[in-house]
C-alpha cells in the first residue's frame, strides 16, 4: 500500500478498508489535487503545499483527505479545509462553531445553517500563512476533542 500522496506527508483520513480500495483512492486523490490546481489555479500550488504541511503539523492525529474540490483536514470530524476559491486565492475554511470573528476571520454563515465549516481566512500569499492562521487551525482542532 502507498503511504503518501503528491509528495507530501503520509497522513490521510481513514481510507477505505481494503488495500485495493486504498490504492485506488490514493491514485484518484492525487489526480484530484492535480486537477484542482491546474490551469489558471496552478499558481496556488505553493500556497496549497504550505497549508497542507502546516495543517498536518498541528497534531499526529490530523489527517487530510483530498476530494475533487477541497482538501479537508480531519481529527474526528472535519476541522478545516483548503479550497481554491479563485485563480489568486485559497480559502482556508475552519470549523469554529459560534466563535465571534475578528476582522480577518470571515463568517461563512455555516453555523446558522448547521454546516461544519463556519469561518474562512483568505490566503493569497505565503506571508498570509502566519501565526494567526496556526492559532485558528489549533483552535478548530481543540474544538473537535
Predicted regions and their residues:
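Charge-dense, helix-prone N-terminal extensions
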Residues: 1-145
